[in-house]
Each structure stands twice: as C-alpha cells, then as structure tokens.
Amino acid sequence: HTNVIHTGHARDIISTLPEKSIAACITDPPYNYEFIGHKWDADEIRRRLNNVNSTKSSTLVKNIPYGSHLAGGVRNARWYERVRENILDYEEWCYEWALEAYRVCKPGAPVAVFNSTRTFAHVQVALERAGFYARDCLVYRRHSGIPKGLNLSAKLEQKGDPDAESWAGWHSSFRNEWEAIALLQKPLENNYTNTVKNYGVGVFHTQDPSGRFASNIIENIPSDARDNGNDYPTAKPYALMARIVNFLVPPSNNNVILDPFCGSGTTLLAA
C-alpha cells in the first residue's frame, strides 16, 4: 500500500490496511462547506473560481449548505435546528473514518486534521470517540482572508435607515486568517520511551526551522506558485505540509503516513 494513491470511500480503503501499520495520519478533509459543489472536475472548479474572481459577479459562493453558516433564509428555530443536524451528521461522518484510522495507527501515532475554526471541535470529538486523545490545536496562520457575513452599516444604508452610519464598523463575523489543525494521538504503550522504542513514534520534533522551540502556531509559510498547474481550490502549501510532517513523523523507512483525503497530493509529496 505504500507510495500508492487509492481511490474510493476513505473508510473502505483504510479497512484494507494492516493493523498498527501507520506512523501518522495527516489529512485535510472536506470542511462541511460546498464551495465548488459536488462535481470535483477541473472544468467545474475553474468555472466557479473564475466567477468568484470576476468583477462583474457579486456572488462569492453558491448553493451554500447549512453547514457553512453562510446560508440565507430566516434565522428561525428550524434554521438553527438544521445547522445543528448538519454539524452532527458531519461529526458522525468523521467518526466513521476515524474508527478505521484508529485501528491502523501504531500506538503513539499522531493524527493532524485540518478544519475550519468553527467546526474543528466536532472533528476532535469525533476522533476522541474513535479512541484517540486530544493533544493540541495547531494554528496555521495565513495572514489573508476576506470578511464573510453581514456588514450591518451597509445593509442599513441600502434600506435607507437613518441609523446606518452609527453602526459603521459592526459586522456579523471576524475576518478569518487562520485554520485549525486538530492534533490527537493514539494512546501510548505504557509510556513515551516504550512506545518510541517499539513503534518509532510518539513524540514530536519541537525544533522549528529557525532552531527555536516550536510553538503551536505555524506561520510565515510561503505560498506555492500560482502557475504550478494545480487547479485544486483548497490545496495547502507544500512548505506547510513539509513542516507538519517534520514535526510529527520521525524519519524512518518504517514510518508510513496516511492521508485519507489527499486532494492534490501535497501531503504525499511532503512525506
């Protein structure tokens, strides 16, 4: 199974892997959004991205599900019920693939799962239910991002409300410039030293590229070149994935990394 991309349902593919064979699981699963819709083909991706970037379009996203919290409609009791149902369905989906990931991970194997700042707690709970225990939340700081939601002053001004100016600077959400990485670990075999000796994993490489003790905030990551031929809309920078691999996985030919949602393959290249 090493150095191979398998296509199929993540849970079903992971079920074919040997027990206690994986040194780390590093993955960037769907965030419970629908930014590019259900068709993951390059033409559809390109069409929607071009629409988003067009100065003639005022629409940022279309067909938004309740999971994004950007969906329109009246915010009545049923709206909030559907938001709750949606996120619990997502948590259950994470739990399903995490159960198999737990089986194939070695004792002490770290699991790093990217997710949005709003939903990563549900991912952590799902993985804890599967048997992993929480270690940290790593922060990938991007130094970018656009505000999403309602500009109250602008909305009131559209309606001709005389109080519009008094609400200048008030918005329904903050500008998001970071992504969460839920960091969990399969329980150790008695202690750290036994686990490392028997399985080659269990501790973190805590020296960052500058030689300092690494923190749980990862920043100053260069972006990949725009003309690298990668049309995948949510690809993570290679430098980011390489740093995470360096932090979590001791270099060894016996250490295999699992990425159940490999996207354009950045984690695979970094490994």
Describe each PLM feature range.
Residues 1-271:
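S-adenosyl-L-methionine-dependent nucleic acid methyltransferase catalytic domains
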